[in-house]
């Protein structure tokens, strides 16, 4: 239950910091890395999406590195 709460809180924080949401800027997925080695610029997701998050267990994934660079600065 604590993990669900923390994930929900994380999602709310991330979505509130996204500057512009549009069809190409939407978060593709949030992926949990089993090894906890998620960091900005790593590939994540089913089709090699790009991670945009600080070092940790959860990756916020976008369709392209350019979108990550735009939304994560």
Swiss-Prot record:
Residues 21-33 form a propeptide. Residues 1-20 form the signal peptide. The keyword Secreted does not apply. SMART domains: Amb_V_allergen. SUPFAM superfamilies: Amb V allergen. Keywords: Allergen, Disulfide bond, Signal. It comes from the Eukaryota. The keyword Disulfide bond applies. InterPro entries: Amb_V_allergen (IPR005611), Amb_V_allergen_sf (IPR036712). Disulfide bonds join 38-68, 44-59, 51-61, 52-72. It holds the Pfam family Ragweed_pollen. Monomer. This is Pollen allergen Amb t 5. It comes from Ambrosia trifida. The lineage of its organism: Eukaryota, Viridiplantae, Streptophyta, Embryophyta, Tracheophyta.
């Amino acid at each position: 239950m604590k993990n669900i709460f923390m994930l929900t809180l994380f999602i709310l924080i991330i979505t509130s910091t996204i500057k512009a949401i549009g069809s190409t800027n939407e978060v593709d997925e949030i992926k949990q890395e089993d090894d906890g080695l998620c960091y900005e610029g790593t590939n994540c997701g089913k089709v090699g999406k790009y991670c945009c998050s600080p070092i940790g267990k959860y990756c916020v994934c976008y369709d392209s590195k350019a979108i990550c660079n735009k939304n994560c600065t």
